[in-house]
Curated annotation (Swiss-Prot):
It catalyses: L-seryl-[protein] + ATP = O-phospho-L-seryl-[protein] + ADP + H(+); L-threonyl-[protein] + ATP = O-phospho-L-threonyl-[protein] + ADP + H(+). This is Casein kinase I homolog 2. The keyword tRNA-binding does not apply. GO terms for cellular component: cytoplasm; fungal-type vacuole membrane; nucleus. Disulfide bonds: none annotated. ATP binds at residues 18-26, 41. It is found in: Cytoplasm. PANTHER family: CASEIN KINASE-RELATED.
Amino acid sequence: MNSQTSVVGVHYRVGRKIGEGSFGVIFDGMNLLNNQLIAIKFEPKKSEAPQLRDEYRTYKLLVGNAGIPNVYYFGQEGLHNILVIDLLGPSLEDLFEWCGRRFSVKTVAMTAKQMLSRVQTIHEKNLVYRDIKPDNFLIGRPSSRNANMVYMVDFGMAKYYRDPKTKQHIPYSERKSLSGTARYMSINTHLGREQSRRDDLESLGHVFMYFLRGSLPWQGLKAANNKHKYEKISEKKQSTSISELCAGFPNEFSKYMTYVRSLEFDEEPDYAFLQELFDDVLRANGDTNDGVYDWMLLNDGKGWESSSSHFSVVAMKRRKNYLGLNVVQNDDSRKKNSTLQTQNMRFKSSYGVRGPRNYSSFDALPSKNAPLVRQEQSASKKTIYAHSSRGYDRVRPMYVSQPSNNAVGVNHPNDNSDSEAKGGFFDMICCRCFS
């Protein structure tokens, strides 16, 4: 193959296809100037709802903060917009699966402190995230300096909750379109109320209990369509008391949920108080925040990285419609495609929507980079369960090594399943070794 056909942005070599989503395709790759491993996202320029330029802008707001990946380049290549971003490790959802779909109290408390810090950072930048879920939190690449740092990715749903200059909070409103993932979204979001900081924190609490319990009481509900399913999930969340949700686990988790659900729409959360709750969990449990997580103890203490030839990961293959809703396949189809042998891959992880997990070697030849065709819209926009006409008021991420032509960016010094009312860009990203 001609090397020129697999180099984009002047010096980024495109490797293998590692994921795809509603809006494009992802490849791994390498920066030819410094041999740094990267991920490259491709988006058709004629996409009805292009996201990569906005994604760049969001990362520009957040750059320099712990747990926010670096993004190096945004530009155009042929029929596509491309974005070059740090190659990270697996998502917390992946690690959760590999740990038998249950985390220890210690791991949940330590992970909660990191996740809470990331959300606080976003809030301090005047944004609410609006799609908290385990898939959107990744750890660092194995053997890297920050291998067990929790990173936050996929800011396609983020929105300003206050004016960056005046700090004036947006007004309270109702009858809003759903945005986020039904399993984890707040009760107020289900009720069509404008989201604010309190909703991100409530969603975090649902994720914490998911990690502790293995599942949430509102998972697995059956309904004729997504609208009715969201309604059932909402009803079950409202009827499940906090004491029932948190039964059998340290009382601090109940205190967390009680506090975040009691916040007013425009109230500033006491993040220090919430952090202290998880410190209390560790102390009461006789643990310390030593950075030793459950996934590091797999394979007789060798860690998840050494599990590539030993683990079979159960993965549900989903198809996505125009609205970005992940529709679970029927049971027969799921069984047929349920087991993914990891012998030929280091790991998998998710930048947003979890999708097909059929990894293959794929070079970024122009002939193979045809624009993706999104499926036809099948849901009405007339209810709060449909995509808003403004595309969820997206704001977005990114960084650049050297702008050229239409490229934008700045120089960087370094370097069970519930339907989702969400349109994320990509499904998965994995670290792979170059031969």
